[in-house]
Amino acid sequence: MLTAFARAFKTPDLRKKLLFTLGIIVIYRIGTHIPIPGVDYSAVQFCIDQTKSNSGLFGLVNMFSGGALLQITIFALGIMPYITASIILQLLTVVIPRLEALKKEGQSGTAKITQYTRYLTVALAVLQGTGLVATARSGALFSQCPQANNIVPDDSIFTTLTMVVTMTAGTAVVMWLGELITDRGIGNGMSILMFISIAATFPSALWSIKEQGDLAGGWIEFGIVIAVGLVMVALVVFVEQAQRRIPVQYAKRMIGRRSYGGTSTYIPLKVNQAGIIPVIFASSLLYIPALVVQFSGSTAGWAAWIQKNLADTAAPAHITVYFFLIIFFAFFYVAISFNPEEVADNMKKYGGFIPGIRAGRPTAEYLSYVLNRITWPGSLYLGLIALVPTMALAPLGANQNFPFGGTSILIIVGVGLETVKQIESQLQQRNYEGFLR
């Protein structure tokens, strides 16, 4: 792989794209350390050192921002507003006929949906930025830190507006950087930035496990985490590559004196057709009750029950609800992202058919049947991959947002495989040996 990478770097066009991508990554990482006005960073650093917490929705967003959220920098919101906007637009495409029509218009329709995604990203950045400022000012961002109320010493409207505008502008810059990578670099820009953000949290998270360990100065716990992480990566790579291939045959057509069609291909249905989306949905939805309790400050019985059973990631109720939410969202997202009837209609239009299955409605029913059968093991795999590392590493101080937890492993492996495949295809075009041998 290293030899192939070296050969890719020797190709002028690929080298230019790789260097451009690396340059954008450096700019992005610099932005995650630039402070915004109105924040007492001595208090922020004190609270970060005191709490060492990375759980819940704040932990999820902090992981996606490369640790910039809890440091309240200009890239504090990271790519989370863009991810949320993309998911919302994808869901609305099923509900709103106008968006569904745009999706079918090809490149022009996709450009329009991308424009809507940008607008929604900025709107969500304003909303999330305001929420972050309010959370930091109230002390809820570091609820266990005695100096949490001193993070934003000036509560004037001007300071609040300045902080929100700065973080919103930072989100717009992150979105622009991601699009630059997509257009002029290697891989999907937002996915690359997500990969880098998660990878940036690895050193500190691993070292904190070592510092909290008691066996052999923490090195045994450190080794256990590395071993579990490598096993999980191998498992995820294996399952993410697994797919059910539905054979498709195209009938021959005579146009003039030439024969067209008659080729054989297949429809690849991945075991994990839903990807990482169900885990993100479940994590976000499950944290909403805890967020309501945190902001309300209530000490009633219902609030205590939520804190005990839903806010605690090690509680049996939290684990059970989290697992079933992942399964539900896996089926839900597959249902809206893959339309068997549309696939069957397109096949029929171009003379394609599945051997032994009639074209049209029987083909759609067969695709739905196969998709449901492979979604079951795929959803169970997602639930287990999200929970097993958490439960196995919980005694060592890890949670579902730990770098070797299910969420981060799924993202890192998925983005890594797609990026390597893209470089592989470009190498093959230049008659080089690829990465995946």
Swiss-Prot record:
User: From what organism does this protein derive?
Assistant: Streptomyces scabiei
Function, as annotated = The central subunit of the protein translocation channel SecYEG. Consists of two halves formed by TMs 1-5 and 6-10. These two domains form a lateral gate at the front which open onto the bilayer between TMs 2 and 7, and are clamped together by SecE at the back. The channel is closed by both a pore ring composed of hydrophobic SecY resides and a short helix (helix 2A) on the extracellular side of the membrane which forms a plug. The plug probably moves laterally to allow the channel to open. The ring and the pore may move independently.
Q: Which residues cross the membrane?
A: 19-39, 69-89, 122-142, 157-177, 189-209, 219-239, 275-295, 318-338, 378-398, 400-420
The encoding gene: secY
Q: Hey, which family's this protein in? A: Belongs to the SecY/SEC61-alpha family.
Keyword set, alphabetical order:
Cell membrane, Membrane, Protein transport, Translocation, Transmembrane, Transmembrane helix, Transport
Gene Ontology biological-process entries: intracellular protein transmembrane transport; protein targeting; protein transport by the Sec complex
Superkingdom of the source species: Bacteria
Which SUPFAM superfamilies is this protein grouped with? Preprotein translocase SecY subunit
Where is this protein localized, as stated in its record?
Answer: Cell membrane
Could you tell me the membrane topology recorded for this protein?
Answer: Multi-pass membrane protein
What's any one GO cellular component for it? plasma membrane
This protein is called Protein translocase subunit SecY
Q: Quaternary structure per UniProt?
A: Component of the Sec protein translocase complex. Heterotrimer consisting of SecY, SecE and SecG subunits. The heterotrimers can form oligomers, although 1 heterotrimer is thought to be able to translocate proteins. Interacts with the ribosome. Interacts with SecDF, and other proteins may be involved. Interacts with SecA.
> Coiled-coil stretches, from where to where?
none
